[in-house]
Amino acid sequence: MLGAPDFRAAAASFLEKHLTTCTLDPDQLGVSAGATSVIEMTSFILADSGDVAVIPAPCYPVYKQDIGNMSGMERYDLITHHELSEIRGGPSLSIADLERAQTEIKRAGKRFRMLILTNPDNPTGGIYSHQQLLKCTNWCIDHGIHLVVNEIYGLSLINTKHSVIREDYTEDTVFYSFANIMQAKQSDLLHLWYAFSKDLGISGLRVGLVYSQNEAFIRAYGNVNLSHTVSNYTQWVLQLLMSDTDFMSSYVANNCERLTESYAVVIRHLKELQIPYVPARGSLFTWLDLSELLVEDTSAAEHDLWLDLYRSAGVLLTPGEGFGHSKKGLFRLVYPCVSKHDLGTAMDRLSGFVLRKRQGTS
């Protein structure tokens, strides 16, 4: 129950052309009803209850439920920085960070079972360099730890040469698919997640993928996938879509262009307001710092600020608390879901809110 053979072949071909740039074996792909199912079953197969998955913070909040509800695996938020300025050039994860996490987990009497990286990252939009991925890979293999890279935003990339944002990028880091490292290493400890929901804007169709060269893992995945399968009709429709190579090439290019234009609208306003943010290279988000507006350095104050912004300005951000980071007052802004005009209106409202707060008039 890994998915229809024709669909998996079409998915492998699509990913080879647009994401991985290396050959994928369709027999090593598992297809499930969305990214949540893929994450949940991967965790269930690879981990025992009480094992620990290490995830650099800030991270996607629902990882906690996705990895824990079925398998009982715990999430460890690995703090690698405090200020946003420390990750303006990209994620700051180092081997020293991994060693520190391993020491703390062992001290607690638990097992460091899995390292999860999202690339491009949610919520920061940062991209792990080839060298960072390689160092993490070698460390995980040396320590017998599973490394999973989630490339769900791998085709949602920002054009860093855009005139409004190009000054933010001093290093020419480009997206490098983890599949290439997997191909070179041929290790049972390396796995790749992908889903079509974000890059293709089809969240409701619920189609996620796992790619692994671990034959025992793939067999187990097929055994437990029965209740998580994607409907034949959905697989057929998406197979036809992926097979239209001219359309898909045009779509991917246009999507990145429009994503960049919307991102530039956000950054133009943040620069004018001098609000700290992390320069994104991909994903659908901007990670920004509104801590100056907190009445006190607490989670409660962050929640109050989040609610005040929504009630008084009609702008809904994602508060930072669930992302597992140490600093209060950080928020995630999701920008691709509306037109540039409406996005501009939202940013004007955010600007007005910030200015009123600074002047003490609200």
PLM features: what roles do these ranges have?
Residues M1-D142, G154-A184, D348:
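Conserved core of the PLP fold type I
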Residues C256-T260, A264, L273-S312, C337:
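Conserved PLP-binding catalytic core of the aspartate aminotransferase-like
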Residues S13, K185-Q186, T298-S299, D308-L317, ...:
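PLP-dependent enzyme catalytic core of the Aspartate aminotransferase-like
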Residues I55, D77, V149, L317-P319:
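Hydrophobic residues in well-ordered beta-strands that form the structural core
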Residues V149, H162-S197, F217-A220, V315:
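Conserved active-site segment immediately N-terminal to the catalytic lysine
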Residues L189-G282:
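PLP-dependent aminotransferase class I/II
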Residues D142-H143, L273, A313, K357:
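Helix C-cap/helix->beta junction micro-motif
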